[in-house]
Amino acid sequence: MKVLGIESSCDETGVAVYDTALSGVPALRAHAVYSQIALHAEYGGVVPELASRDHVRKLLPLIRQTLGEAGLRIDELDGVAYTAGPGLVGALLVGAGVARSLAWALDVPAIGVHHMEGHLLAPLMEDDPPQAPFVALLVSGGHTQLVSVKALGSYEVLGETLDDAAGEAFDKTAKMMGLPYPGGPQLAALAETGTPGRYKFARPMTDRPGLDFSFSGLKTQVLLAWRSSDQSDTTRADIARGFEDAVVETLAIKCLRALDAAGCNTLVVAGGVGANKRLRARLQEAAQRRGGRVCFPRPALCTDNGAMIAFAGALRLQAGEHADAAVHVTPRWDMACLPPLAAARESGVGNRE
């Protein structure tokens, strides 16, 4: 089954083709992503209306490009998957409308995919994929969640942020210190040059039981430190390092607690912040110490992309799911409400025998 995946939940237009006849890395026949960073930079954040209009402009050219790179004609597709939520409603509707139209014209099934399930399943596209049960850390600009995955499609949220997501905290902290948009990657790059330990910030909510997160207080702590400093380039880098260390250590502590709570030893990390080098190194170190395993998607598949939507959609289409002819999107959508992936269980994909 060759499935076209369309991602348009926010400010990246992603398209990919996943082929279930193959496995591992080669199964991803082609993928392309167009980022709207330059479009939104002058506003310091994503403008929903501009995001929607840009998806309209970029989606069809990206589909043509991706099919060309995959060496496929459009009539060779067996299904179309699209992000149905959560996300910006206008942006979601663009992708859903194009996907449903293509599916109708080609007389193939279409399926709406949960954006965060796409992220969660992305590491399964790599060689030697993780097997359920495992714990997933979903960490991005809009979400920070710890999820127990008993089987593919069977999700229990163990903890989540009570305010800012980790990626959002990165972006807002960077903006407070005068770094350009998008701030998160800029702050992480700057932290590489900072002096460890000069600024030591709190590890929020790690001094009490529970698996929820909170980053708003940390953000305020950094703001106060910045305002009272000499605001030199050196100090900016040192504060960035202190902030990143605090976030990384907080995530690591909570991940280890979640593994203990779930009674498993495999951790999956996905979402845009999952590309952070310091986070990857810290979690790999923690996994080795406990004799466990941590799995990441390749960095290009950490940020929003069509590949994860094509893959998640392919699994659900194989399970017999498909959308009706109407265009449905769900801007707010609880992943725990998703149905189990029966076909994936039967085939052994991502589940222990």
Curated annotation (Swiss-Prot):
GO molecular function: iron ion binding; N(6)-L-threonylcarbamoyladenine synthase activity
InterPro entries: ATPase_NBD, Gcp-like_dom, KAE1/TsaD, Peptidase_M22_CS, TsaD
EC number: 2.3.1.234
Species of origin: Xanthomonas euvesicatoria pv. vesicatoria (strain 85-10) (Xanthomonas campestris pv. vesicatoria)
Origin organism lineage: Bacteria, Pseudomonadati, Pseudomonadota, Gammaproteobacteria, Lysobacterales
Gene Ontology biological process terms in this record: tRNA threonylcarbamoyladenosine modification
Cofactor needs: Fe(2+)
Stored CDD domains: ASKHA_NBD_TsaD_bac
Record's catalysed reaction(s): L-threonylcarbamoyladenylate + adenosine(37) in tRNA = N(6)-L-threonylcarbamoyladenosine(37) in tRNA + AMP + H(+)
Cellular component terms (Gene Ontology): cytoplasm
Cofactor note: Binds 1 Fe(2+) ion per subunit.
PANTHER family attached to this UniProt entry: TRNA N6-ADENOSINE THREONYLCARBAMOYLTRANSFERASE, TRNA N6-ADENOSINE THREONYLCARBAMOYLTRANSFERASE, MITOCHONDRIAL
TM regions (residue ranges): none
Official protein name in the record: tRNA N6-adenosine threonylcarbamoyltransferase
Role noted for this protein: Required for the formation of a threonylcarbamoyl group on adenosine at position 37 (t(6)A37) in tRNAs that read codons beginning with adenine. Is involved in the transfer of the threonylcarbamoyl moiety of threonylcarbamoyl-AMP (TC-AMP) to the N6 group of A37, together with TsaE and TsaB. TsaD likely plays a direct catalytic role in this reaction.
Annotated positions binding Fe cation: H115, H119, D304
Classification via NCBIfam families: gcp_kae1 (TIGR00329), T6A_TsaD_YgjD (TIGR03723)
Subcellular location: Cytoplasm
Family: Belongs to the KAE1 / TsaD family.
Keywords: Acyltransferase, Cytoplasm, Iron, Metal-binding, Transferase, tRNA processing
Binding site for substrate: L138, V139, S140, G141, G142, D171, G184, N276
